[in-house]
Amino acid sequence: MLKLLLLTLPLLSSLVHAAPSLAMPREGIVGGQEASGNKWPWQVSLRVNDTYWMHFCGGSLIHPQWVLTAAHCVGPNKADPNKLRVQLRKQYLYYHDHLLTVSQIISHPDFYIAQDGADIALLKLTNPVNITSNVHTVSLPPASETFPSGTLCWVTGWGNINNDVSLPPPFPLEEVQVPIVENRLCDLKYHKGLNTGDNVHIVRDDMLCAGNEGHDSCQGDSGGPLVCKVEDTWLQAGVVSWGEGCAQPNRPGIYTRVTYYLDWIYRYVPKYF
């Protein structure tokens, strides 16, 4: 996974010197454990062909024919749907793959880099998938859902298990429970150790923070889902986007806030199916 090369211009000078890893997309799970085989049936693996169909990002099945992911996963170098494949929920990467083709990639038009927000994209599968007990969609939240600070949610993926420590074979799906961190508090945390003025918002309104020291997403599953259980229903609160390091003090993981983009999502994805 490539590093994001640019930072938001007002933050550039302070962040490059104080936190050189801030531009890393989020790609895996730290402080978690292997997920049991019947959990997270909406989790998908995005693949790109590099001598083999290699996992590079995560995503979530939100409709039998649509996958939600991060825009930075499908930037200009991966914009051709013919060069992508989707693997539905499986316990171990690369074991008996059944890869699905993609007919359309739709990145949010406001996306430039993850730190500027709008880090969200949709993939339309060539054919709808069969919904089963092992593979089914995750519900999107109502626009009124705020996911208050302290709410315990889960993030899943196949990425690194610590800074620069890859997930070892057989590459099981990992999960970790993370608390929601209120945006203003998260923004204050990200200002610690930086010379950036308090009037410069690092954490934008379209973002959501979750995680604490030792429990976080990391560097293989950007685009994956952050889900929270609300009244016995799993709702996708966020899309794994970016952060500084993995599970570092005062640096929660930053996610795209799904409720902020519901109107945009439903412009393409049928709400009822």
Curated annotation (Swiss-Prot):
Q: Which InterPro entries match?
A: Peptidase_S1_PA, Peptidase_S1_PA_chymotrypsin, Peptidase_S1A, Trypsin_dom, TRYPSIN_HIS, TRYPSIN_SER
**Its Gene Ontology biological processes?**
extracellular matrix disassembly; proteolysis
Report the record's disulfide bonds: C57-C73, C153-C228, C186-C209, C218-C246
Major place of residence = secreted
Tissue occurrence: Mast cells.
Keyword field: Disulfide bond, Glycoprotein, Hydrolase, Protease, Secreted, Serine protease, Signal, Zymogen
Sugar attachment sites are: N49
Task: Give the matching Pfam families.
Answer: Trypsin
The GO molecular function terms of this record are: identical protein binding; peptidase activity; serine-type endopeptidase activity
The record's subunit annotation is: Homotetramer.
Family matches, as PANTHER family: CHYMOTRYPSIN-LIKE PROTEASE CTRL-1-RELATED, TRANSMEMBRANE PROTEASE SERINE
What is the official name of this protein in its record? Tryptase
Q: Which organism is it from?
A: Rattus norvegicus (Rat)
